[in-house]
Amino acid sequence: MHLDNSSCNLASLNLMKFLRDDTASDGASGAGGNMSLDAERFAKVVELVITAMDISICFADFPTEKIGETTRAFRQLGIGYANLGALLMATGHAYDSDGGRALAGAITSLMTGTSYRRSAELAAVVGPYEGYARNADAHKRVMRQHADANTAAQRMDDLDTPVWAAATEAWQDVLRLGEQNRFRNAQASVLAPTGTIGLMMDCDTTGVEPDLALVKFKKLVGGGSMQIVNNTVPKALKRLGYQPEQVEAVVAHIAEHGNVIDAPGLKPEHYEVFDCAMGERAISPMGHVRMMAAAQPFLSGAISKTVNMPESATVEEIEEIYYEGWKLGLKALAIYRDNCKVGQPLSAKKKEEAKTEAPAEVEKVVEYRPVRKRLPKGRPGITTSFTVGGAEGYMTANSYPDDGLGEVFLKMSKQGSTLAGMMDAFSIAVSVGLQYGVPLETYVSKFTNMRFEPAGLTDDPDVRMAQSIVDYIFRRLALDFLPFETRSALGIHSAEERQRHLDTGSYEPAEDELDVEGLAQSAPRQAGPAKAATTAPAAKAQEPAAAPSPKQAHNSTELLEIQQGLNADAPLCFSCGTKMRRAGSCYVCEGCGSTSGCS
């Protein structure tokens, strides 16, 4: 949170590695052992890491040239720490306590003060960062603010007091050396999340976070989960004065129940030491915010930390958390409401199975499995020769005795081995589908109007134009095997039906309304019943002819043609792509004037 188009070189230290057990040195008994933070060794490691981080900027590559320029000009570093939650637990401090916050503030102050002291020492050798000249006053003012915050910080006990003393000395050196040498780095410290690297660093907790739960499950990328048990509990119990057998009993209780409530031999006043972010004894959201506020005055950047809130948290409660964080001077704040995501990397428990009673087993009534209906040895069939765009071929369509289509064979003349193989494979696929019950109309709807070469005129009077061989084949199959209603809905009609449409306005075949003898003797059929035609008064013969009734659609295809004035199955123009209009038995394009070849 410094400059746009910049980067921050991060590093983190495992605080538990600097916790010193003084029991052996002072001869104290195992129970209630003394612990201290090795401030001197911690400062030495910070100096070493800061030096390495600054050197790495000279050799690092960056995503964009602008980011590289800004980073080299300001040389921001981001040293931080991890395992603070485990450190506080091991030293007997509750996370949400004055003692815990005092120790966290002391460690952060020592880390940042030591970092800027080493930055000033580096500047004496290799010079300050490029942007220091125009930011000198602001930089030195920030250093004074850090030092003032260190002076005003509250000392709580013997554990944090030596750390505060080392931090005070470091900040005095920062002010003195910074005035003389200037600073090598515009920023020195942040608190990063250390989510995945924390596991590789042997950390029980990440960043400034408390432990999520004493027993937790981590979701793995490849599936499944792994159980993670806090290894700091025995040290904390020892620090609090419990005997080894009591420690074993409490640890066994935690492994079984996941918390310390009602653990054998554990005093209720010590429960708070083992409070976690989630679970039966969860740290309050403001406890997280107060811990961040304890560390923020001693950091160059911000804190990447999650404020855990229960699933029942309201909008007003979340608003209050952000408002309090602003009042306490936090630079950044992130809320995580439990179960707000479908999958979260860490959880306090495995997903519980539904506790509702299992529904009564329902007996399977119908279970459908497709069954192949093979054709008999002797089968009726039709072989059709065709020509599409000059390409000749033969189609054999065999059917069941009940007239249902069962298989199709295709053979193209002058074909090579590749085309012959493709046609055989296509025929087998369609035939097997038909025998397993795939309706022919499904194939027709999918394969008609597919356009590729060869295409054009055919020698079939019922299908004068085809946009491809596949288009022709399934139009021919539809005409041979589908009922009128089905293929009419698909826009497929024979030459006779198209002629009837031109004469009568309907594709449907005429109904036999009169008997054979009546047909032989009667006049042409009228629109009304025959009886009405013979009894009509003579005067009506002189009346003007009634206007023809509007054309009525009997199916979706005819309705589309009435609305658009076009044939639903008309092809697209080969020249301009416009929908063509039927002209006789062929088609003409109204866009460019092209014809299908015979109009």
Swiss-Prot record:
Biological process annotations from GO: DNA biosynthetic process
Compositional bias annotation for Low complexity: 526-553
Keyword Oxidoreductase in record: yes
A Pfam family it matches: Ribonuc_red_lgC
GO MF terms, alphabetically ordered: cobalamin binding; nucleotide binding; ribonucleoside-diphosphate reductase activity, thioredoxin disulfide as acceptor
Highest taxon in the source lineage: Bacteria
Entry EC no(s): 1.17.4.1
Cofactor(s) the record lists: adenosylcob(III)alamin
Residue numbers spanned by region Disordered: 519-555
Residues noted as binding substrate in the record, renumbered to the chain: P193, T194, G195, T196, I197
InterPro entries, A to Z: RdRp_reductase_class-2, RNR_lg_C, TSCPD_dom
Note accompanying the cofactor annotation: 5'-deoxyadenosylcobalamine (coenzyme B12).
Catalyzed reactions: a 2'-deoxyribonucleoside 5'-diphosphate + [thioredoxin]-disulfide + H2O = a ribonucleoside 5'-diphosphate + [thioredoxin]-dithiol
KW Nucleotide-binding (keyword) present: yes
Keywords for the protein's UniProt record, in alphabetical order: Cobalamin, Cobalt, DNA synthesis, Nucleotide-binding, Oxidoreductase
Signal peptide: none
Reported function: Catalyzes the reduction of ribonucleotides to deoxyribonucleotides. May function to provide a pool of deoxyribonucleotide precursors for DNA repair during oxygen limitation and/or for immediate growth after restoration of oxygen.
Family: Belongs to the ribonucleoside diphosphate reductase class-2 family.
Name listed for the protein in its UniProt record: Vitamin B12-dependent ribonucleotide reductase
Lineage, opening ranks: Bacteria, Bacillati, Actinomycetota, Actinomycetes, Kitasatosporales
Gene name per UniProt: nrdJ
